[in-house]
Amino acid sequence: KTFLKNIGVNQTVTLNEKDAIEYSEDFSSTKATKPLFQKTQIKPNVIHKESNFVDFNRERLIYHMCSSEGPKMTKGDINGDNEEDILISSSKGNTPQILIKNGSDYFLDQKNKDIFNDLKNIENSEILPFDADNDGDLDLYFSSGSVEHSIYSQTLYDRLLLNNGKGEFIDSNQTLPDINNKISTGVVKSGDIDNDGDQDLFVGERIKIGSYGLPGSGFILINDGSGNFSNQTKEIAPSLTNIGMITDAAFEDIDSDGNLDLIVVGEYMGINIFKNEGSKFVRIENKLLDEKGWWNEIHITDLNNDGKNDLIVGNHGLNSRFNASKSKPIRLYYNDFDKNGFGEGIICFEAENGKDYPYALRHDLIDQIKSLKKKFPDYESFKTADITNIFDQKILNQSDIHSVNTLETSIYIKKEGFEFEKISIPKETQFSPVYSINSHDFDNDGD
């Protein structure tokens, strides 16, 4: 290996292998440990096939693709035989799959082949098994997500399939979340919000199609007891409207008053907690609202065995080109910068001089906003341009500005009421974005 320290800037450094020194790690004290998990093979083998759609061809300035966030997996006893089956969502052009458990084996469900074929034209972003019509079996909510469809497409309506008790499904023929909202759904959760004995729904909008940076809305759908849902967001939770780009949510009785409260997270969002006051959800103003991240997942469990459930929230992580803090946040400026009727989101970082610079390179910006080519004819003219050099201050003042001040996957320990304390966790949890979290006593040590 070759070690160089305190290297000066503006120079070419030449390394030669013959000048390197021998170096090896000392593993003498390392003890072999028995793996906690072993690889297993479930047959039949289900392979997820992603569509060829490329988000960047439509929106040049986004930092990741929202059309390929699947597949999602969940489990539930679909056919009433007291064994948990596996459900796997699908990309556009493919059908969702159910693996029916039979003892130690699985077989691919064939009963619902025709009705699942009707779902091929949607990007199935989530499958929620729950008893919608109170008949004792699990029905299936299929959410339609991604950005591949037109905002006018009927395929953006979510679908509710009702179970006949034998694992055979029929379409409820409901337009969900309602007839006026064709959305790209990111998450759906069930819970008895109004304590009337049936399961109601929260549906979260992942993204405004073609308008990355515009906040989406959450929807509260109330069950009439027979599996018919009505959108009552305006009456029950108006503050869910335009709340953000929602990725996950959870119902939990945080204050132990017998009512399910709601937690909602997403991109450029704080951790939003809504107290269920019986007839209305009211947003809680606490420190978690200031924890603005690129949140992907929320998991609730009692980590310290104090009888109170804590929060584990999956974020982007700290192992990428992006950095964010409260003193130097990532900012997204959203506006129709070129006045063509379509908005653009410009993602920026704050430099040491306090100015915001776009992450996008000159050619990416010009691909999205053609008028900038005249202003910046070459890379030399662009290399020191901050956001105020690129766009007039007037249009920046009119822009929606969203920020991110933490990229850490985080644990928040429940205190009293709606208060939580953030604790440090191992650095390994920050090596990649976290999209799914589970908790269990995997090592059989009692916690």
What label would you give each PLM region?
Residues 20-68, 100-122, 159-183, 215, ...:
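Blade-edge motifs of beta-propeller repeat domains
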Residues 69-80, 123-134, 162, 176-177, ...:
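Beta-propeller blade termini
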Residues 80-90, 134-143, 195-204, 256-265, ...:
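Acidic/hydrophobic-patterned starts of short beta strands in beta-sheet-rich repeat architectures
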